[in-house]
Amino acid sequence: MDSIKNRIMKEYEDLQKHKEENTVTVWMVDNNIRHWKGKIKGPIDTCYQGGIFVIDILIPDEYPFKPPKMKFDTKIWHPNISSVTGAICLDILKNEWTPALTIRTALISLQALMCEPVPDDPQDAVVAKQYMSDIKLFNETAKHWVEEYANPERNFQKKIKELTDMGFTEQQARDALEKNNEDVEKAINYLVGA
């Protein structure tokens, strides 16, 4: 059991060490070694460029012999990702997982999937149908979703407004959000001293 925890911590530390050079970053949820959030940048020259996508990562007790459970928290228009639940259809998160793979590998594979959708093996049939029948409309829709849901500045401004509507100053809201990984609930607890 300790060797599994050591592996998980090593993977986490490796991602932290290289987060500036990576287009993927991770953090633990409530210091839970088995529950992380990941952020991946929308790949350049794709309809996802400019977006920041948050991934929920649950690491099972059987890790690394079983894959991490991942889903998109950020809404995304993609044939292999549910536009409703964020569930992902990716072989390495299912039957192609091997213990030699890492969470970083899985996150980079998600980024690659954003570059090269596989509409023949969809998670979201409606999106896949649009992708195959009208790629121009698909790209326009995906870009709209990036602007609406994966735009970090726009989302940050919404969070600031939510806190200022509660009576906090804009600076208090910014500081609290920055200290709490932009989690509004934690920022509120921080601001009220809970």
What are the residue ranges of the model-derived segments?
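Strand-helix-loop interaction patch of compact alpha/beta domains
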Residues: M1-I88, I92-L101
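Short alpha-helical basic/polar micro-motif
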Residues: F53, I108, Q171
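Loop/turn elements at beta-strand to alpha-helix junctions within RNA-recognition modules
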Residues: D61, M166-Q171, N180-E182
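Short, Lys/Arg-enriched alpha-helical microdomains
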Residues: L177-A194
